[in-house]
Amino acid sequence: MSNFKQKVLTAAVDRYVLTPTQCMMLRQDAEVIGMKRAPVLAKDGVTRTVSRTRTCTSCWIPFAPHYKWLYGIINELTEQINAEHYRFDVTGVQQLQILRYSPLQKFRWHWDCYTSEAPVRKLTAVVNLSAPNEYLGGGLQVKADIENVRFIREQGAGCWFPSYVEHRARAPIWGTRWVLVAWLTGPAWR
């Protein structure tokens, strides 16, 4: 008999997801790819880029050989964290996204799973690409118990949580906050 207890309302933090050098490289790559107003899926099911809910900029990291290492890190850590905390049926990852929050830019309280059709977003991962001294205020806030919460603002640290847990990105009042976001998917919930 296993002593496993599923932690469906817990967020897990890994403080060593990416190195500072990798974080800076991804930020530079995002600038080259091109940052645009981040889209948001509205309640009516339409994707919009003009919204008071989400005011940051974003770019997508392609599934390309150049980023195989990054997708590998996310998949490997997700496998470990999922086995330890959730044991969700995760079978893939959506295209990664880099977000840039300039002063007063935010993403209000929201969930990352909007459909019951497969593939369903099951886990969300947010990795800090900025050092804590590069911005004031702002940051990820999750409506869940967070293990190792004291590390959540460190550059290269990542936070995993179920995609159905409400969360938000608070606006920095000074500086710029960069993050990498991953959505891990799987078949419909049973």
Where are these regions (language model features)?
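A general, composition-driven signal for non-globular sequence regions
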Residues: 1, 41-42, 46-48, 94, ...
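Non-heme Fe(II)/2-oxoglutarate
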Residues: 2-85
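Catalytic core of non-heme Fe(II) oxygenases with the double-stranded beta-helix
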Residues: 61, 68-190
